[in-house]
Amino acid sequence: MNGNKLPDFFILGVQKAATSTFHKILNQDSSFSLPYKKETHFFSENFNKSLNWYFNQYNNKTYKIRGEIDPSYIYYKKTPQNIKKHIINPKFIIIFRKPIDRAYSHYLMSKSRGYENETFNNALELENKRLENGSKFSFSHHSYLSRGLYHKQVEKYKKVFPDSKFLYLKYEDFLIIDNRKKILRKIYSFLNMKFKDDLNISFHENKSALMRFEFIRDLTHSDNMLRTLFKNLIPSEYIRFIITSKINNLNKKNIAQRKLSYSTINKKYIDWNNEQSYSLSKSCNLDIKSWII
């Protein structure tokens, strides 16, 4: 065991492509060391923090391999260079999702958290304007299309890490329960790890949900005096994370995700979906026929 060890691999995303589920599955395996909180954002927006802070985000237990799953890393422009400053050639796993479906799932998440009041079409129209002012809030919560520029994001990593190994997967394949073991075996093989057949792989983390009480949602997802007081009363990030996670889970009411009707979307976004899909297939050799509308 080495508590001060940097990751051997990263699952870079993408956002809304089962990264929370992968984190929970791999966290069952004692051979893996993962951060207690799935997304540390250390190599993206928290790069000003110390390495000691980063090491403290991990559960220091006996392990064979250390990794991090953080979908902000595929999107944040400086992350490849930030990683390179500390790690020469880590392995990268990227799980992609049909671009327009990913955008819609992101939109529903922002809406459920009280961050979005527009219709889906209007939100897409407003995206560039929202992102132009450099707002961290919009960068996180209104980046529906810009997070789907997969080809550009992959090429950025390949340029910085020409000697690293990459594994590309599709979210849609993982949705099929019968495929899950096959995909996980592929991940384990890629990481030179022995797959464990006793892992629970049947759950689905971070499902679509409504918040039962909006005032609780706003307390846990917005900056306010009570959150500041909570932070002062409980200095430990880990304990705050545990408490907040439990409150959020109790406040969630899982629902079946509303399926996106492509006929209601402006045609230019359908064209955008197809263009991004074709571009990705060329750079990653993925079969994206099912993504074309």
Can you describe what each PLM-predicted range is?
Residues 1-293:
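Anion-recognition interface
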